[in-house]
């Protein structure tokens, strides 16, 4: 692939609808780990764009899908961080995957908000 398309890699609109935020932290971590493996294999990621910062409108389902790292109250418009934002912040602020974080998310039965 690299000879045909170059080594540049852009990951866009990468996220999961998870209304109760039970699996999003593991999802984020597993995709960050895949980016690390891509780097180790010689690809050069140019960007990773999580979908989405806030809950939003999805054409087929309206406001039922919950992709946001931040929950949006549709009445008051208040935005509250979901527990998985802690995992996203940990990875992005360090620009790395902390080994302890990996163990916690992969092997823990606790909700993601209780991990950090």
Residue positions per predicted region:
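Non-catalytic scaffold segments within catalytic domains of secreted glycoside hydrolases
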Residues: 1-116
């Amino acid at each position: 692939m690299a000879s045909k398309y170059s080594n540049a890699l852009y990951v866009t609109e990468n996220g999961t609808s998870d209304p109760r935020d039970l699996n999003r932290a593991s999802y984020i971590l597993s995709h960050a780990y895949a980016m690390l493996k891509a780097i180790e294999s010689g690809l050069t990621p140019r960007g990773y764009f999580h979908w989405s910062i806030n809950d939003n409108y999805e054409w087929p389902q309206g406001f039922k899908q919950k992709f946001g790292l931040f929950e949006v109250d549709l009445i008051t418009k208040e935005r509250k961080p979901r527990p998985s934002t802690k995992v996203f912040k940990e990875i992005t602020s360090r620009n790395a995957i902390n080994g302890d974080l990996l163990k916690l998310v992969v092997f823990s039965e606790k909700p993601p908000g209780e991990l950090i």
